[in-house]
């Protein structure tokens, strides 16, 4: 038995706890956490911009896998810290909870973690180098895995001011260390919209691309950008106010800025920020926005005779087709979770409600035609929702009669043990027929679907439910959709989408994923939705047979089998395989290949669906042209 004494108790010093438990500080050590490192450094530069000391930021992706963030702010202080007895620069990069944010005099508003942020970035980097232009001198210090390897030294003179941070993520910490320029570009564009007049340059030296973002129109311009390709029903509505609020520490100010616009689309798009930090999970500002808008539209609905006395709009009616950007600035933001994805300040709710009620009443009372346009849109949504409810009730009534519940084309499995069962949604009747013969009837069910199904991105809920193929999928899965989703009624443990390996197959796969993403999202979040990977080729070499799943694999086999006589058969569709081959290659759990569909960042997935499935062909073309050379097979 090992001795358990004082020596067994490990004390983590400096940045060791960050390296031991990185997820606690940046959320994950996957793609999301990796990009979070860049956001932390950029957020510090943004705080300088918000304080009025910086109007330019440059982010550069270097060929060696490092990233550099430069600004023209004041430059991090380099003088000796009174408590630590060493340069403030070194303190900021090596001590948690050190930095300008914690002194009320340095920043009135800040979003970046200031010190927590850059010290965490330093801890999780293979190396980091910081240069500061300040007081006529250039200072530099280098760190490796969070530890200084050089002192703070003067390396030259300058007439500039600002900070340059360059770092390379540590492969010992991160599962992948390659930055995705699209993800960074998305965030940098967001910041430029939120801080009007701030110029952000982004250079990707790996792919040789340069972009500049500067938007003097602020969040009004942001709403127009989000609505490109959609038909707007009116001009963007914009409000901005500073509200005095009571807090635990007395009285504070909250700056509330909101821009919104209705379009002819069927989905809502609400993007929210607190101190420029994106609040993916919303918070008190979003809750207040939604409830205040719903209350106001109900008041005006009755005033303009759209609603009877006892009738009302629901929140979902008011938000369909709505695009909104909500940006608040608060002195002491309370973010829930280490990665700051939800705002918790109660006083913000009061500020947003008051600002919205007073400002929107002024706008609506001065523009009755604007109000009527919005109310007409909301009214048609309400009527469609009520029609969809009737259609859902019809689907439910069908469900009661057990023998007519399930679609006629569904070949069900015999097992009632949900977690062991699988539903294959198969493209085409002929492949569906082969799959029915190939399957293991004990635990595998097969539902064939015809050709191209309805595009759910462009369809209203009642139209969706009238579509026979979508209705078949909903009934077979069993959970219901949207607000009626009930996980306990799920009929299968896994849902596997099986389509041809061609463009049409990819299109149907995308449509099906859109259906699950928009209306049965918990199934994706729980990791229950999969994509089957049928082989692209069959190679015959003498008596041996190989199934090949990619062009790269084919090239490897050709090299390996050099000198032998080989026959190569390309499968254009699932229907070209006989049931035995289909079982062996695509359905047998022992030998098949399947990809689990995940939503690491729901917003990114949503953006992809919006581009590929929405109404803007130019965005779709730009996306495809941009990625066609990089990606052999686009898995979405």
UniProtKB/Swiss-Prot annotation:
Keyword Cytoplasm among record annotations: yes
Binding residues annotated for Mg(2+) 2, in chain numbering: 500, 502
List of residues binding Mg(2+) 1: 427, 500
InterPro entries, alphabetized: DNA_gyrase_B_C (IPR002288), GyrB (IPR011557), HATPase_C_sf (IPR036890), Ribosomal_Su5_D2-typ_SF (IPR020568), Ribsml_uS5_D2-typ_fold_subgr (IPR014721), Topo_IIA (IPR001241), Topo_IIA-like_dom_sf (IPR013760), Topo_IIA_B (IPR000565)
Cofactor note: Binds two Mg(2+) per subunit. The magnesium ions form salt bridges with both the protein and the DNA. Can also accept other divalent metal cations, such as Mn(2+) or Ca(2+).
Site (Interaction with DNA): 452, 455
GO cellular component annotations of the record: chromosome; cytoplasm
Gene3D superfamilies for this protein: 3.30.230.10, 3.40.50.670, Histidine kinase-like ATPase, C-terminal domain (3.30.565.10)
Enzyme Commission number(s): 5.6.2.2
Catalytic activity: ATP-dependent breakage, passage and rejoining of double-stranded DNA
Alphabetically ordered keywords of this record: ATP-binding, Cytoplasm, DNA-binding, Isomerase, Magnesium, Metal-binding, Nucleotide-binding, Topoisomerase
First-tier enzyme category under EC: isomerase
Assembly and interaction partners: Heterotetramer, composed of two GyrA and two GyrB chains. In the heterotetramer, GyrA contains the active site tyrosine that forms a transient covalent intermediate with DNA, while GyrB binds cofactors and catalyzes ATP hydrolysis.
PANTHER family tied to this protein: DNA GYRASE SUBUNIT B, MITOCHONDRIAL (PTHR45866:SF1), DNA GYRASE/TOPOISOMERASE SUBUNIT B (PTHR45866)
Sequence similarity: Belongs to the type II topoisomerase GyrB family.
Function, as annotated: A type II topoisomerase that negatively supercoils closed circular double-stranded (ds) DNA in an ATP-dependent manner to modulate DNA topology and maintain chromosomes in an underwound state. Negative supercoiling favors strand separation, and DNA replication, transcription, recombination and repair, all of which involve strand separation. Also able to catalyze the interconversion of other topological isomers of dsDNA rings, including catenanes and knotted rings. Type II topoisomerases break and join 2 DNA strands simultaneously in an ATP-dependent manner.
Note: Few gyrases are as efficient as E.coli at forming negative supercoils. Not all organisms have 2 type II topoisomerases; in organisms with a single type II topoisomerase this enzyme also has to decatenate newly replicated chromosomes.
Protein name according to UniProt: DNA gyrase subunit B
Source organism per UniProt: Thermotoga maritima (strain ATCC 43589 / DSM 3109 / JCM 10099 / NBRC 100826 / MSB8)
